[in-house]
Amino acid sequence: MNIDHKTLTLGLLVSATTILPTPLQAQTIDESAYRLADAASLWSTTTNAAGLTLDNLVDRGVAMMEAGHESSDFHRVQEGNQDNSLRFFTERYQHLGRYLYGYGKFDFDMGRTKNRRWSDVRRTYNSNPFISGSEVSGSYDRQDISLTAAVGTTAFGPWRFGLRLDYQLGDLSRLRDPRSRSEMLDYRLAPSFTYSFGHSTLGLEGHYRRYKEKIPDITTVQTDPNLRYYTMTGMENANGVVGGYNGYMREYVNHEFGFRLSYAWQSPSWSSLTEAGIDRGSEGVYGTYKYQPGHYHTYRYAVANKTTWRTPRWLHVVQARLQYEEGYADEYRQRLTITTDSLTGYNTYSYVNQMTYNKRYRVRLLDAALGYRLNSASVHGINGYIGVDGTLRSVHNEYHLPASSFAHHYADYGLSAGHGFFANRFWVDAAFRLRQVFDNRLNLADVSAPYAEQVWTADYDDYYTVNSWRASLALTYQQPITVKGRTSMWFIRLDGGYLHAANSQHNSRASLAIGLRF
C-alpha cells in the first residue's frame, strides 16, 4: 500500500460521521460507508488537529497486514529494480472523555530493495546534495516505524484547540561491501486552533519539525583494494576515493518551522476548505570531527482546496493543490587543524572553514494537481464512482562553477472508476494513467565522470525522457464477523498494477492485505 492509499484510509476513519445517519453510526461501518465519509470530509485532509471535531467523528479503527512485491525495469539507477515488503498498519479515532477527541496511528514497514547503488541515504533526489554511496549495486534492508498522536477539543464557544505529534524512526542497511547503515529520526509537533462563526471557520496551525539522518560508520567483510566510495556535492560532481569508506561518518540535521492557515465553509449540501502554508528548513551536514561540506536551506509554499457538494443521488468532489519548493546549498572548503596539548600530549582535531560558495547548488520544484470525482451515493454509502485527475511537475537542478543543469517536466493524468457488487460486499477499483514528458534538458560540465555516465546520463536517456502508461486493479471483499457480541468488518484486498514505458521497459507490482475495521 502506497502513501496515497494510507492517506485515504486516514480520511475514511477521520470523517466516518460527516453525512451518515445516526442509526448507521452505531453499526459497523463497511467499505461503502467509509468511502462516503472520506469523500465528504474536509478537515481530515489537513494536519490541523483542532479541526478533528468539525467533521463530527465517532470512535472507529482499522488494523491490517499487507505483503507486497514489485519488479521494475523502468526505474532510476539509485532506486533499485525489485522490492519486497511486509507492512502492519493500525489506527484509531477515540473519544477521550467529554471534551477531547483523539487519533492514534502505528505503521510498521519492512522490506528489501535489490540492485540499488550510488546512494546510501533516504533522500536521494531534489534534496540535500551532500549524499554518498558506492557504484557497486547491492541489496538494502529497511525498517520504518511511523507514529501519530493527535487530540482536538470540542467547541469552547467559537474556539477549538488541538495538538498533533508525528514521529518516525527508520533504518536503511546495505548488505554488500561497503556496508553502510543509515538511521533516521523525524518528528513534527503542531499546535493548532480554529475559530467558527456562522458557516465559516478559520484555522491556524504552526509546526516545528526536526529531521536527523546519520550514517555512524561503514564496515566491510572483505578487503577490496579497488573499492571506491563516493561523496557528492550536486549534479555530476562526485569524489571517489579508494577505501573512502574507512572512518566515514555523515550526519544530517534539519530544523523546519512552518504554519498553515485554513478557511472552511460547511453546510449540509455544500462545503469547501482552502489551506495555505509556508515552511522554512535549515539543514546542517556533519562528518568526522564536525567536518561540514556545506549547508542546505529550503523554502516551501503551498495552497490546497477541497470542495464537495451533495444532491440526493450524487456527491461531487473537487480537489486542487499547488506547491512550490526552492532549496539551495552553500558549499564549504574546510581545512583540518590539529592542536596538541603541551601538558597532556593529547591532540584536538577540528575543521576551519576557509571558503564558502553561496548557493552553489539549487533545486526548484513546482507541483500542481487537479481532480474531480463523481460518486453515486445513498445515505448508507457510495455505490460507485468515476473520476479524472491530472498532475503537472517541474524539476530544475542547477550547479554553478562549473555550470551544470537539469530540467524535467511531465504531465500525469488518469481516469479511475470503481463499483460495489453484492450489496457492496465486493468492490472493484480500476485506474489508467498516462505520463507525458516534455521540455527536458541535461547539461553536464563533465560528461565523462563516473557519476555522470552511470547515473545522470543513464537516467536521462532511459527514464526522464520516456513516456509511459500504467494500469491498476484492486479487488476487495469484506465480511462481518461477530466475536463475543462485537461485530467487526473483516476484509481482504488484492491489488495489482502494470506499467509500460515507450522504451519497452515495464514494471509490475502485486500486494495482498488482510484486515478488519473495529
Where are these regions (language model features)?
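Outer-membrane beta-barrel "beta-signal"
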Residues: 29-30, 195-199, 506-518
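Outer-envelope beta-barrel architecture signal
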Residues: 57-63, 98-104, 157-161, 198-202, ...
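Transmembrane beta-strands of outer-membrane beta-barrel pores
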Residues: 67-71, 108-112, 167-171, 197, ...
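Outer-membrane beta-barrel translocator domains and adjoining extracellular loop/strand segments
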Residues: 73-79, 115-121, 173-180, 215-221, ...
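Residues that define the transmembrane beta-barrel architecture of outer-membrane proteins
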Residues: 82-88, 141-147, 181-189, 253-259, ...
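Residues on the lipid-exposed face of transmembrane beta-strands in outer-membrane beta-barrel proteins
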Residues: 88-94, 147-153, 189-195, 259-265, ...
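Short, flexible helix-coil linker/hinge segments at the edges of structured domains or between repeats
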Residues: 117-131, 207-253, 282-293, 336-348
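Long, internal scaffold/assembly segments composed of regular secondary structure
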Residues: 240-388
